[in-house]
Amino acid sequence: MSNIEDYPFPTGLHLLTQWQSGDEAARKEMTAFFDDAIAGCFDADFSVLAPPDRVHSTASVHMLGLTILHDLYNIESWAYYNTDPYRYVRTNLAVSRLLGIHKFYTTWALYAFTCEPLGQQMMYPDRFPP
């Protein structure tokens, strides 16, 4: 099992960089890390509140999460956003941790979730957000 504490900033960022460059060992490590994240092994860590004496900032990481899951598991866009909320949230929180973000936020493709119930048809490409 992976230990999320093994990926403090910038270690997690270095792993992401190696994976993006096509390093096969990094891909295997990423797969093990995300297997554990998706299984809920890091949920206790995700529940720890960020220190209140700091200013926290983050970015929308859902697109990087989609890219990772498409590469590692061949999960396509529609399935990523629509089928498993636990996988979606855990993936985003794990990506945040690898990027060195201390306060966890969950972001999503709000435009897709608001336009579809109103009758609009969304286009879900295989590995890009709607």
Regions found by a protein language model. Give the residues of each.
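Catalytic cores of TIM-barrel enzymes
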Residues: 1-130
